[in-house]
Amino acid sequence: MIRSTDGGVSWSARYPTIVNSPHGPIQLADGRLLYAGKELWTKAQRVGVCESRDDGQTWHWLAEIPARSGDDPKQYHELHAAESGDGRILVHIRNHNKANEGETHQAESADGGKSWSTPHPIGVWGLPSFLLRLSSGKLLMTYGHRRPPFGNQARLSDDHGRTWSEPLIISGDGAGGDLGYPSTVELADGSLLTVWYESLEASPRAVLRQAHWRLSV
């Protein structure tokens, strides 16, 4: 991690955060930062969460997320978390175990991240998932869809992550499966901005694309 205290004019040196995951940490209602991820470049490669109580200056291991029976936790990747309206914390996990390979799994914590349920599939093929709690209280997940239609999709939950809607198509015009990792923010007017990377058919380089969209539900 690197930090800036002057609006991005200058940056600190890099320092470790214990776990790694592309979508980074979230801030909880109690002010803590929670980072769900994986201990990369270690022999154990634990999957779990660490926390910071000083705005990300230092990090401490909090809890391991248990593996589903028969799963190799080393095949869990690229986690992301969100705090739901009922106070639970949800984590989405990119699963590469043979059972439900390529699907997003979900684990929950009801005690602020100190302990976790066993990950379970939620019926969503696509990864990795980015979670966002909307101003309406609903949860939104956005994820790359690396088979036709190639692009990015979203799903909503209005019961704090217990069930998820049918997919909403954000983009479906990709040249192939080399795309995704969407991140989404809710703007002041309630609209959504989603950004992702995508490789083009006639170019050796990838590009960043964006979609400005609104929910109709």
Task: Give short role names for the model-derived ranges.
Residues 1-217:
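Asp-box/BNR beta-propeller blade signature and adjacent active/binding-site loops
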